[in-house]
């Protein structure tokens, strides 16, 4: 338990890489695995990452490009429309 109290899921790396790197990994993993909202149908918890930057909703079936660890990039707030290939 002592390894994961501060760094959470990044505790799997043990004492390797240093605590500051493992804290950054903790923050990234927390954002990646939190329940995300689908920008098309609005359902929460149905969005899954297909690969790096590719996200898909299991409810409505839409697939879109987002950021590597979150379904919407920082620029997405400026662009309301999505380009969807399907």
From Swiss-Prot:
GO biological process, one term: translation
Keyword Zinc: yes
Cystine crosslinks: none
Cofactor mode of binding and number, as noted: Binds 1 zinc ion per subunit.
InterPro entries: Ribosomal_eL37/eL43 (IPR011331), Ribosomal_eL43 (IPR002674), Ribosomal_protein_eL43 (IPR050522), Ribosomal_zn-bd (IPR011332)
Acyltransferase as UniProt keyword: no
GO molecular function: large ribosomal subunit rRNA binding; structural constituent of ribosome; zinc ion binding
Zinc finger residue extent: C4-type: 38-60
Binding site for Zn(2+): 38, 41, 57, 60
Family per record: Belongs to the eukaryotic ribosomal protein eL43 family. Putative zinc-binding subfamily.
Name of the protein in question: Large ribosomal subunit protein eL43
UniProt organism field: Aeropyrum pernix (strain ATCC 700893 / DSM 11879 / JCM 9820 / NBRC 100138 / K1)
Source taxonomy: Archaea, Thermoproteota, Thermoprotei, Desulfurococcales, Desulfurococcaceae
